[in-house]
């Protein structure tokens, strides 16, 4: 296929798609140019079905540092493991694409997005999401798309699609919404306490823009799309399915209705073991033994899936006996740990999270050096999910994509209420340890994080609570669930997480397993989540009503002063000489950022105060009109030089010493003498002129009678 180019203007920028020139051996590939951002997307599919019991989809988002004209860090000077932002972007693309493959599809699919050039004012992640959908859609991979995604900002009451970096900085909303032509199927958002009404409007505005991009993709698919390949889907033997349902469904239904999680798991597992044992014995010598046993396992999974959904939609009974809008029992506790800077333990049913706060100087802030300009990240929220939290063994090691994603969601929810750096000059780290899990552990970590921050004396603007909403839909009727547990998440159609304060929403995240949900469902879920959020906030308030007025005794003491940017070099000195001398004299630790924020850290408040005085004197500047108690340091015929403070001298001209004529400066002043002077002028070279006579009363003018003519 020869090179073909398609263009449109989207959100004020040119969107260009090129195909047929590069990566032609992939099942589908496109180059997407949006503004000056360029992303190559290649989609490939294995020829055979995988043997696992899940769809092996892998989505990568690879940031090449050359895209921003930068060298990679590190000794090897080449890209290593994906950054946190790249990992989150890969998840962002994966989530709306995954539901668009047929049930039972098991061929391995890889979608690789490579950022080739980067423009911070033209979203490379959204170009990659567009490219991922389009590469799949024009390929022979059986993808039921297209989908698309956009970013939405909210500035001065107006919604902006795919904002520039400057617009996003001014925005009260950072929203990514994706979906099909018919409905939304993925949401990721942080917000500055916005109402449910504004959030819903933002979602709908975003979906309108998504539909524009999908229409563009459909034009391209019509022009160059390949015929879809015929692939084998995982389908069970219908006769075997009917037989197992007839003989074992009643027992499985009873097991599913056991209310306590571990007991329910044991009961369902016992039923499954009986069925599997029966068919293992019957077909042990059969030539298709592996396929039959795979079908048996899949049928049992489908039976459990169907029963959970039937109970909720028809009988309005949840697996643990709750109403559809009922939250599990709640408990909140602070000060679970000694010595640490703050801790909170939050329990919701069989989900429990411990959050631990650590405060440090800004020098400990994380340096982010990606495609965007380097910056310091002050607040970190890390989420850990050990396997013992669900009573299982498993892999232990570096955080995976899920843990990174859940940590980022909690970070977005809580950072909206943090005090400014000027109000609270600390780097802040929260670590959420999930101790038990039966669904909604990410939202439990947000609640525990609120407790830890308040217990640690961080003056947050308001407490934040989170809740996870679910959905069971048969295409015609639906039920929205409050506070979903693990089984409802696993067998349900939606996981919609909402976090916020009493004033509004601070974070949203939605993933669905069906192709999309309607505005009506979104509105109902948001309203139900608000009611639940307020109920949880009441429990948090019962544990701690407001942030403590002081930090923990173990927390570091930090103070901050602001200096002019051009004074940074004065405080640091040549080769760091000045700042090293201050540190040696006072024993403090000092961090200075490029904006002139000076953080002083010590366990001794007196040392901090002494350091502030030293720095203040170093950066002090004379000001016209101010009066100083100065010392004469040099005498010349034309006047005297006086030291105002530190290394700042001023000239008192001979005419500014007194109102009467001064014949000889040395007759009036001597070196070492202390005098009061007023600054009357500072020239463009920084030279200071001062006056003594300006502080003296002006003598009356002598009478000067007119001469007679």
From Swiss-Prot:
Checking SUPFAM superfamilies in the record gives:
Eukaryotic type KH-domain (KH-domain type I), Nucleic acid-binding proteins, Polynucleotide phosphorylase/guanosine pentaphosphate synthase (PNPase/GPSI), domain 3, Ribonuclease PH domain 2-like, Ribosomal protein S5 domain 2-like
Positions the record marks as coiled coil are: none
Q: Which UniProt keywords apply?
A: Cytoplasm, Magnesium, Metal-binding, Nucleotidyltransferase, RNA-binding, Transferase
Q: Which EC numbers does the record give?
A: 2.7.7.8
Q: Cellular location of this protein?
A: Cytoplasm
Q: Which CDD domains match?
A: KH-I_PNPase, RNase_PH_PNPase_1, RNase_PH_PNPase_2
Q: Which Pfam families match?
A: KH_1, PNPase, RNase_PH, RNase_PH_C, S1
> Which chemical reaction does it catalyze?
RNA(n+1) + phosphate = RNA(n) + a ribonucleoside 5'-diphosphate
Q: What class of enzyme is it?
A: transferase
GO cellular component, alphabetical, reads: cytosol
Which amino acid positions bind Mg(2+), per UniProt?
489, 495
Q: Which cofactor does it need?
A: Mg(2+)
Kindly list the GO molecular function terms attached to this UniProt entry. 3'-5'-RNA exonuclease activity; magnesium ion binding; polyribonucleotide nucleotidyltransferase activity; RNA binding
> Which biological process annotations from GO are given for this protein?
mRNA catabolic process; RNA processing
Query: Residues in domain S1 motif?
Result: 625-693
Query: Which residue range or ranges hold the KH domain?
Result: 556-615
What is the recorded function of this protein according to its Swiss-Prot or TrEMBL entry? Answer: Involved in mRNA degradation. Catalyzes the phosphorolysis of single-stranded polyribonucleotides processively in the 3'- to 5'-direction.
Question: Which HAMAP family does this chain map to?
Answer: PNPase
| Protein family | Belongs to the polyribonucleotide nucleotidyltransferase family.
> What is the recorded name of this protein?
Polyribonucleotide nucleotidyltransferase
């Amino acid at each position: 296929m020869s090179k073909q180019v398609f263009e449109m203007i989207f959100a004020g920028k040119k969107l260009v798609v090129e195909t047929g020139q590069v990566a032609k051996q992939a099942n589908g590939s496109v180059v997407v140019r949006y503004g000056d951002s360029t992303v190559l997307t290649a989609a490939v599919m294995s020829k055979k079905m995988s043997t696992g019991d899940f769809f092996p989809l892998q989505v990568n988002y690879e940031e090449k540092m050359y895209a921003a004209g930068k060298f990679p860090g590190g000794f090897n000077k080449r890209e290593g493991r994906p950054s946190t932002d790249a990992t989150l972007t890969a998840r962002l693309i994966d989530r709306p694409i995954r539901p668009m493959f047929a049930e039972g599809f098991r061929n391995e699919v890889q979608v690789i997005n490579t950022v080739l050039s980067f423009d911070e004012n033209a979203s490379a992640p959204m170009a990659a999401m567009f490219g991922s959908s389009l590469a799949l859609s024009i390929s022979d991979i059986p993808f039921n798309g297209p989908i698309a995604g956009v970013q939405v900002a909210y500035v001065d009451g107006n919604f902006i699609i795919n904002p520039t970096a400057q617009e996003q900085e001014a925005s009260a909303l950072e929203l990514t919404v994706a979906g099909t032509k018919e409905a939304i199927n993925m949401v990721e958002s942080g917000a500055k306490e916005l109402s449910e009404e504004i959030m819903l409007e933002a979602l709908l505005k975003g979906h309108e823009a998504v539909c524009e991009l999908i229409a563009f993709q459909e034009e391209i698919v019509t022009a160059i799309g390949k015929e879809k390949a015929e692939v084998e889907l995982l389908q069970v033997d219908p006769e075997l399915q009917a037989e197992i349902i007839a003989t074992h469904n009643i027992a499985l239904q009873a097991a599913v209705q056991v209310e306590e999680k571990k007991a329910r798991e044991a009961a369902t597992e016992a039923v499954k073991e009986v069925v599997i044992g029966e068919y293992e014995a019957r077909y042990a010598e059969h030539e298709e033994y592996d396929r039959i046993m795979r079908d048996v396992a899949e049928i049992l999974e489908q039976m459990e899936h169907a029963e959970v959904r039937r109970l909720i939609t028809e009988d309005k009974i949840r697996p643990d006996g709750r109403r559809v809008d009922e939250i599990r029992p709640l408990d909140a506790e602070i000060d679970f740990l000694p010595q640490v800077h703050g801790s909170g333990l939050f329990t919701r049913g069989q989900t429990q999270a411990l959050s631990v706060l650590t405060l440090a100087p800004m020098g400990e802030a994380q340096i982010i050096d990606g495609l965007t300009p380097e910056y310091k990240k002050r607040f970190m929220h890390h989420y850990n999910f050990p396997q013992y939290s669900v009573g299982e063994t498993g892999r232990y090691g570096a955080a995976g994509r899920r843990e990174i994603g859940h940590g980022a969601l909690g970070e977005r929810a809580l950072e909206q209420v943090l005090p400014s750096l000027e109000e609270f000059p600390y780097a802040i780290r929260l670590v959420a340890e999930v101790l038990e899990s039966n669904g909604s552990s990410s939202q439990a970590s947000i609640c525990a994080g609120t407790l830890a921050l308040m217990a640690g004396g961080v003056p947050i603007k308001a407490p934040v609570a989170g809740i996870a909403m679910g959905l069971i839909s048969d295409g015609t009727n639906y039920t929205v669930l409050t506070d979903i547990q693990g089984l409802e998440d696993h067998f349900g159609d939606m996981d919609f997480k909402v976090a916020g304060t009493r004033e509004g929403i601070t974070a949203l995240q939605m993933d669905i397993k069906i192709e999309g949900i309607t505005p009506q469902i979104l509105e109902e879920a948001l309203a139900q989540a608000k009611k639940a959020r307020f109920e949880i906030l009441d429990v948090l308030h019962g544990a701690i009503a407001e942030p403590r007025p002081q930090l923990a005794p173990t927390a570091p003491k930090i103070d901050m002063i602001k200096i002019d940017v051009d004074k940074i070099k004065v405080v640091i000195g040549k080769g760091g000489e000045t700042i090293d001398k201050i540190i040696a004299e006072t024993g403090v630790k000092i961090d200075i950022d490029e904006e002139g924020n000076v953080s002083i850290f010590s366990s001794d408040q007196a040392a901090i105060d002494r350091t502030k005085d030293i720095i203040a004197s170093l950066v002090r500047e004379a000001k016209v009109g101010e009066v100083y108690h100065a010392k004469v340091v040099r005498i010349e015929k034309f006047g005297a030089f006086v030291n105002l403070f530190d290394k700042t001298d001023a000239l008192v001209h001979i005419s500014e010493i007194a109102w009467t004529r001064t014949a000889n400066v040395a007759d009036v002043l001597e070196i070492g003498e202390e005098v009061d002077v007023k600054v009357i002028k500072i020239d463009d070279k920084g030279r200071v002129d001062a006056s003594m006579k300006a502080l003296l009363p002006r003598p009356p003018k002598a009478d000067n009678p007119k001469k007679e003519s």
